[in-house]
């Protein structure tokens, strides 16, 4: 009985074992054939554990001015590292850690703009290594090399990529800035960098490969690579020389106490923005930003009497204007409100033409009564007020022209009770400069892909026909009387620049306070000037607006200086002092150096001879250029070697011309005129040399020379 029971148990055990092994065999067969266990693909799981994938970061595109001068680009960036652990040093003759903390701190302090005490505090850390920030973060290659030349034991660097703006605080709000995120990608945060972030960023690629247990690529395997597509390059309509003039005038305004300001210059014929600066500004390399909004497109304000250009023009277009008609100036009562001229006593009975020259609020108010709110608003809308212009800059505002009652309409006729932006003023003024055509402002000249192919071209865009040539010509004559003193009521003769035939209109606007009433006091106004020149056929439109300036002559001072700088640069002088044909540049290629030098001196031009060769092989400017007296002509000779020359006090334009002719790159800082450079005079030029040039505004140079 027991024996039989034992046999049954054994057979049962054997059966269980057989079933178990059958199950295992079936399971293994299933796994080997399907690669799936518990709904998990084992093949994919194993592959993922052995496969590494690296992101290939696309290089961000650069931003240039219209001529190809670089305004924003990627550069190698370095962070200063101090190794503190003594065990890093295995050979005392070649220490690999910081040995002399005192010497290291005192040497680095002026170089990375940190106090010696702060650096000493960091060097006394018990850590293996420390990062010397903030001053030692994001330094340039030039500064890295200067630190390396000090041979400080234990000082090293980590490398990264950062966005660099070679001109520092220059066109800052337009360019904006971009910063590196935690994934080492660079993203735009303001300005063009933000608006065109997708186009500048490009498309990242990747590298996928099989790795061993230590994370290294297995040599016998072939990686899968999808190359990154670098970002597009953006060329702005900005003329760097005109931008420099604008920046210099903004520097002057900033030395006076004010709230904010904007100066913008536009090509009257095309709508290209040639220069624009706002204050308070910032350096996009250091991001010392007090406001993230650009006044040019984002600030709305009541503009004041510059709007009389458009309310008077509206009356002309509606056949309601007779410039010789008399009216009583001084004040007018509308409903229960009294509107006064700035000259509260008025000028007596004067014509409407005289009222425009004197910036009479009463004249504008009476014209608004003839027009009515609908016709005035309709004309303002034709010019683009109340709508975004669509310029390709972020955070553009549309302003407000929702006047309703008769007194509000009167206020709107002289620029109160409605709000605009500077870019809207530029667009509206284009109507007067272009025989009634409203031209859309634009700031991007072209966009190229990573291969240099042009994929977008900016162009002139006529939005509508808002006025007739007859009426805009009339308005230009009125704007001339504002500044030339030819009419008894004119008061803005301190704006007059007769050699460039400037015309324009002043503006003084009250500022609304937080309580709803207007601010009081001598300086609580927005002062502005809309100008264009030459008056009979404008090439340039500009707008200067300053909030709460304490220097009441600042706007006319800046206006005259800006017009003279731009007019001379663009050769728009309307007087007899214009360049004559003997200032025209010829082709000097293959001519004898001495003969060319004498020829240019006789033309009262300034030859800059590069090298000691007896023949000219390259020149700039090229044949046909018309120059002003004492302008430089750069001549590259047939020399076996070239030596550095003195460029102190040169303008950025001249420096750029020289280095372009030499086919060399350089780093620059600041703007204005050259005050120092990194090379030694008469050293032989090596195209691989790293050159740095420092500029300062003229007023700073003059101030330093008198100290």
Language-model features and meaning:
Residues 109-113, 152, 179, 201, ...:
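Sec-exported extracytoplasmic/periplasmic mature domains
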Residues 118-127, 259-270, 329, 393-397, ...:
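Acidic/histidine-enriched alpha-helical segments
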Residues 56-59, 66, 75-77, 152, ...:
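Extracytoplasmic
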Residues 499, 544-549, 554-556, 560-707:
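Ligand-recognition elements built from short beta-strands and adjacent flexible loops
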């Amino acid at each position: 009985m027991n024996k039989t029971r034992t046999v049954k148990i054994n057979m049962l055990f054997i059966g269980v074992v057989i079933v178990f092994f059958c199950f295992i065999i079936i399971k293994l067969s299933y796994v080997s054939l399907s690669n799936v266990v518990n709904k998990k693909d084992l093949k994919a799981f194993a592959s993922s554990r052995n496969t590494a994938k690296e992101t290939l970061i696309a290089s961000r595109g650069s931003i240039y001015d219209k001529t190809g001068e670089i305004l924003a680009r990627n550069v190698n960036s370095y962070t200063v590292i101090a190794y503190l652990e003594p065990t890093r040093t295995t050979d005392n003759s070649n220490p690999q850690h910081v040995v002399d903390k005192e010497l290291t701190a005192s040497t680095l302090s002026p170089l990375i703009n940190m106090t010696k005490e702060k650096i000493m505090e960091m060097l006394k850390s018990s850590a293996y290594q420390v990062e010397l920030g903030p001053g030692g973060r994001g330094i340039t290659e030039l500064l890295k090399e200067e630190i390396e030349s000090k041979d400080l034991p234990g000082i090293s660097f980590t490398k990264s990529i950062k966005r660099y703006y070679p001109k520092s605080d220059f066109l800052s709000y337009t360019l904006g800035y971009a910063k590196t995120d935690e994934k080492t990608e660079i993203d735009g945060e303001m300005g063009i960098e933000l608006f065109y972030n997708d186009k500048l960023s490009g498309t990242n690629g990747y590298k996928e490969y099989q790795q061993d247990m230590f994370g290294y690529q297995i040599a016998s395997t072939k990686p899968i690579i999808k190359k990154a597509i670098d970002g597009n390059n953006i060329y702005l309509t900005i003329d760097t020389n005109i931008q420099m003039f604008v920046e210099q005038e903004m520097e002057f305004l900033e030395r006076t106490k004010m709230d904010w300001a904007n100066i913008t210059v536009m090509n009257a014929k095309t709508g290209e923005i040639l220069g624009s600066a706002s204050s308070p500004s910032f350096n996009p390399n250091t991001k010392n930003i007090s406001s993230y909004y650009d006044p040019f497109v984002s600030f709305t304000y009541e503009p004041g009497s510059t709007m009389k250009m458009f309310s008077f023009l509206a009356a002309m277009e509606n056949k309601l204007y007779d410039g010789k008609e008399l009216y009583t100036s001084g004040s007018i009562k509308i409903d229960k409100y009294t509107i006064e001229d700035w000259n509260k006593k008025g000028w007596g009975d004067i014509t409407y033409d005289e009222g425009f020259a004197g910036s009479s609020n009463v004249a504008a108010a009476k014209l608004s009564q003839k027009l009515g709110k609908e016709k005035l608003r309709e004309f303002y809308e034709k010019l683009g007020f109340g709508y975004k212009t669509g310029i390709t800059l972020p955070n553009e505002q549309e302003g407000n022209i929702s006047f309703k009652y008769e007194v509000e309409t009167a206020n709107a006729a002289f620029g109160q009770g409605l709000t605009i932006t500077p870019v809207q003023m530029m667009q509206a003024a284009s109507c007067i400069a272009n025989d009634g055509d409203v031209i859309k402002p634009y700031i991007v000249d072209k966009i190229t892909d990573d291969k240099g192919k042009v994929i977008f071209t900016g162009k002139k865009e006529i939005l509508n026909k808002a006025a007739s040539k007859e009426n805009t010509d009339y308005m230009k004559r009125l704007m001339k009387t504002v500044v030339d003193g030819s009419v008894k009521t004119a008061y803005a003769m301190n704006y007059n620049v007769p050699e460039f035939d400037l015309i324009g209109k002043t503006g003084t606007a009250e500022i609304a306070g937080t309580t709803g009433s207007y601010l009081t006091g001598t300086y609580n106004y927005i002062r502005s000037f809309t100008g264009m020149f030459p008056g009979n056929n404008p090439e340039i439109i500009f707008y200067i607006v300053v909030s709460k300036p304490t220097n009441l002559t600042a706007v006319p001072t800046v206006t005259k200086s800006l017009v003279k700088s731009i007019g001379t640069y663009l050769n728009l002088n309307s007087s007899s002092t214009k360049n004559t044909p003997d200032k025209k540049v010829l082709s000097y290629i293959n001519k004898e150096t001495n003969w060319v030098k004498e020829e240019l001196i006789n033309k009262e031009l300034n030859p800059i001879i590069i090298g000691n060769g007896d023949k000219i092989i390259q020149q700039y400017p090229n044949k046909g250029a018309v120059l002003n007296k004492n302008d430089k002509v750069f001549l590259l000779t047939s020399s076996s070697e070239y030596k550095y020359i003195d460029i102190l006090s040169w303008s950025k334009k001249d420096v750029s011309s020289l280095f372009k002719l030499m086919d060399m790159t350089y780093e620059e800082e600041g703007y204005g005129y050259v005050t120092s450079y990194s090379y030694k005079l008469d050293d032989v030029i090596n195209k691989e040399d790293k050159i740095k040039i420092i500029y300062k505004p003229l007023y700073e140079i003059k101030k330093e020379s008198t100290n």
